[in-house]
């Protein structure tokens, strides 16, 4: 038995992971993994809530798991697994669906934003996305969930469902579901688009030039940075509200180089965009090189990668099935006598 607090998090395999996923999420997991019991999921069930390529889903799932490890996640101390491989996620999701008032769901900001993009193709799955996320979290009795500000509302929903709709209604002397607390990931959580410094970097952006993917070649990185939006000011600034692109690139540069933003701002106060972009490009290529090298070793050894995912699944399944069994028992489901 471990006395470590438990953490649960994950990323969708909807496309290549980018530097926003790395700096804003995975890097934080790397820092947390030594002191916490860590479960990291590739959330492929979430990936099908919008249109997707069936030929790419499996490939992207394996690639995402490989990138977790290439970025520093240690499979010897973390359980890395694929969401759809554990049926308890879908089963608990349905139970939570039946316990959650629909007006709670209608308040979800992200659905409103994403449904505008989807138009008439918006699915029930996208509407139900926060319930599946709640099931993901609650299945593992997570103490903490690392989230960005944009996911905080979804975590609050998970807490409300657990406390008000399950524990308060069906719990007797003890809670049925553990109430998780957020770890708000501030460092790197606001990596913005290369084309628009006011818009978050996203895998779903149709413009490939809006992001640097972790597997981009040096040639592609160079081209994307050259085309990245700039402004007419001289020198690089971080706190000027009229210069979101300058702020964004300085933030990324700071995280990659390990230098304080204030130091960079001082060093680059008289540096033009052309010169800065060359320096910035070199830093990105240098920072991504070891990740890309480790990734190639992993992806070219599918047997070892599958072994890691099987081990992760086995550990995760024990915890998930125990929680699901407890929920079903307390909610009155029939159980076959053994």
UniProtKB/Swiss-Prot annotation:
One cellular component (GO) term of this entry: cytoplasm
UniProt: L-tryptophan binding residues: 136
Enzyme class at the top of the EC tree: ligase
GO biological process assignments: tryptophanyl-tRNA aminoacylation
Catalytic activity: tRNA(Trp) + L-tryptophan + ATP = L-tryptophyl-tRNA(Trp) + AMP + diphosphate + H(+)
Positions that bind ATP: 12-14, 20-21, 148-150, 191, 200-204
Pfam families per record: tRNA-synt_1b
GO molecular function, a single term: ATP binding
Location(s) in or outside the cell: Cytoplasm
Keywords in alphabetical order: Aminoacyl-tRNA synthetase, ATP-binding, Cytoplasm, Ligase, Nucleotide-binding, Protein biosynthesis
Chain span(s) of sequence motif 'KMSKS' region: 200-204
SUPFAM superfamilies xref list: Nucleotidylyl transferase
Short motif 'HIGH' region, span: 13-21
Recorded family membership: Belongs to the class-I aminoacyl-tRNA synthetase family.
Oligomeric form and interacting partners: Homodimer.
Matches recorded under PANTHER family: TRYPTOPHAN--TRNA LIGASE, MITOCHONDRIAL (PTHR43766:SF1)
Free-text function comment from the UniProt entry: Catalyzes the attachment of tryptophan to tRNA(Trp).
Name of protein: Tryptophan--tRNA ligase
Organism: Prochlorococcus marinus subsp. pastoris (strain CCMP1986 / NIES-2087 / MED4)
Species classification: Bacteria, Bacillati, Cyanobacteriota, Cyanophyceae, Synechococcales
């Amino acid at each position: 038995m471990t006395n470590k607090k438990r953490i649960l998090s994950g990323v969708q395999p909807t496309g290549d992971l980018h530097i926003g996923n790395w700096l804003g999420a995975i890097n934080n997991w790397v820092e947390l993994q030594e002191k916490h019991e860590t479960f990291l999921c590739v959330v492929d069930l979430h990936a099908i809530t919008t249109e997707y390529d069936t030929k790419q889903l499996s490939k992207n799932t394996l690639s995402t798991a490989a990138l977790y490890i290439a970025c520093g996640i240690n499979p010897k101390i973390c359980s890395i697994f694929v969401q759809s491989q554990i049926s308890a996620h879908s089963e608990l999701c349905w139970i939570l669906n039946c316990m959650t008032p629909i007006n709670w769901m209608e308040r979800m900001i992200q659905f409103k934003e994403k449904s505008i993009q989807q138009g008439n193709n918006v699915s029930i799955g996208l509407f139900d996305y926060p319930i599946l996320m709640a099931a993901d979290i609650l299945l593992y009795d997570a103490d903490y969930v690392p989230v960005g500000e944009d996911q905080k509302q979804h975590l609050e929903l998970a807490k409300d469902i657990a406390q008000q709709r399950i524990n308060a209604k069906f719990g007797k002397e003890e809670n049925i579901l553990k109430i998780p607390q957020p770890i708000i990931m501030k460092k790197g959580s606001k990596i913005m688009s290369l084309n628009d410094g006011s818009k978050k970097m996203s895998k779903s952006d149709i413009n490939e030039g809006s992001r640097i993917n972790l597997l981009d070649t040096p040639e592609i990185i160079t081209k994307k940075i050259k085309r990245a939006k700039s402004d007419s000011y001289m020198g690089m600034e971080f706190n000027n509200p009229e210069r979101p692109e300058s702020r964004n690139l300085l933030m990324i540069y700071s995280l990659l180089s390990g230098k304080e933003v204030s130091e960079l701002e001082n060093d680059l106060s008289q540096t033009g965009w052309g010169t800065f972009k060359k320096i910035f490009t070199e830093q990105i290529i240098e920072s991504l090189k070891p990740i890309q090298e480790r990734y190639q070793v992993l992806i070219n050894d599918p047997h070892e990668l599958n072994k890691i995912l099987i081990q992760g699944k086995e550990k995760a399944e024990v915890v998930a099935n125990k929680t699901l069994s407890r929920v079903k028992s307390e909610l009155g489901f029939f159980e076959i006598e053994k």
